[in-house]
Amino acid sequence: MEKLYEGKAKEVYSTEKADEYIIRYKDDATAGNGEKKATIAGKGELNLAITTMIFEMLEKNGIKTHYIETINNTDMRVKKVTIMPLEVIVRNITAGSFAKRYGVEEGRVLNQPTFELSYKDDDLGDPLMCEDHAIALGVITKEEYDYLRKETLKINELLKEFFLKINLKLVDFKIEFGKTDDGQILLADEISPDTCRLWDKDTNKKLDKDIFRRDLGDLTEGYKEVLNRMRG
């Protein structure tokens, strides 16, 4: 296998098949666009296990993803896609940068889910990008924007229901999409406590990367609690 790319939390490798990749989940944790860094033993394995269960659930409910199979504790086989240069962000409850941006308290349930795009560029700080700007700059087409919005809001409903069954509130999350060589758009990357804010429904205890961002305790204990609830 040849390493093709290394990001903050994952590595991408070629395989014997031209249309498949291996994604290796790392134990690295970052926050603030990489300003805060640490290596946390077991984090990659936990994120892979959680992402696997979520992708399998989404596939069963009609969401097309890049997921093929999980090979071992750190590696996932996926369909080859070119990642679109956008992070898609959905918010159900105010928290983090959204609460700070609008001067509202954390924990307020929004009247409806919000759909935001962020342009993926660490040097620019991943700026928010509205529909008009994304289309005008040629980042996506109008048809792609409409598809991303519809698919993402469907994913949100599935995830909210999934987590509510295990007494977790889905506060917000970010996802990424990729395109296959023939132009099909697939949900890619991962869905884990690295990319979602998850709060205990009764206590609002944070069980996500805010544990690391805000120095709230042992990150892996929070992630293990999420995984254990998912496994029942």
UniProtKB/Swiss-Prot annotation:
Family listed: Belongs to the SAICAR synthetase family.
Protein name: Phosphoribosylaminoimidazole-succinocarboxamide synthase
PROSITE patterns in the cross-refs: SAICAR_SYNTHETASE_2
Pathway where it operates: Purine metabolism; IMP biosynthesis via de novo pathway; 5-amino-1-(5-phospho-D-ribosyl)imidazole-4-carboxamide from 5-amino-1-(5-phospho-D-ribosyl)imidazole-4-carboxylate: step 1/2
Catalytic activity of the protein: 5-amino-1-(5-phospho-D-ribosyl)imidazole-4-carboxylate + L-aspartate + ATP = (2S)-2-[5-amino-1-(5-phospho-beta-D-ribosyl)imidazole-4-carboxamido]succinate + ADP + phosphate + 2 H(+)
Organism of derivation: Finegoldia magna (strain ATCC 29328 / DSM 20472 / WAL 2508) (Peptostreptococcus magnus)
InterPro entries named in the record: SAICAR_synt/ADE2_N, SAICAR_synt_PurC, SAICAR_synth, SAICAR_synthetase, SAICAR_synthetase_CS
Keyword Lipid metabolism: no
Keyword annotations: ATP-binding, Ligase, Nucleotide-binding, Purine biosynthesis
PANTHER family: MULTIFUNCTIONAL PROTEIN ADE2, SI:DKEY-6E2.2
Enzyme type, top EC level: ligase
